[in-house]
Amino acid sequence: MSEVKRRLATILATDCVDFSKHIESQEEKTLSSLKECREIIDPIINKFSGRIFHTAGDSIIAEFDSPVGATKAGVEFQKSIKDRNLTEDKNPKLSWRVGIHLDDIIIEGDNIYGNGVNIAARLESQSPVGEILISDVVRQQIYLSLIHI
């Protein structure tokens, strides 16, 4: 059996709020909005050296080398989505939740696994709409950088 590849990473989990409800009532407009949001989110993740590992419809799992980079990406993309929603008048105004956690992960092919991924997803599900919820370990790591975020 081959050795499992592990490394420390910051995991960002995000999900679109009430996506199923939107898609049920306005399928094509919701898909258009989702595509517009992804055109905002994906480049921001890349800008802060993140890599998208998994997407499932309206959710994204990305990993970053740095908790500061992950947090900056989350802050910037939430602000950009809010700005988009201020000017959007045809399609649904989609909102997102974000959870960020730092932990050891398992890398297998093009995917990541581990308890850290699950914790980031749980934080995302508990995050207020349009906000970011970070774990205590992330808070400890970015504490001195908070002034600049």
Regions found by a protein language model. Name each.
Residues M1-A73, K79-S80:
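Catalytic NTP-binding/metal-coordinating core of nucleotidyl cyclase/transferase enzymes
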Residues E39, I61-I147:
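Catalytic beta-strand-to-alpha-helix segment of the class III nucleotidyl cyclase homology domain
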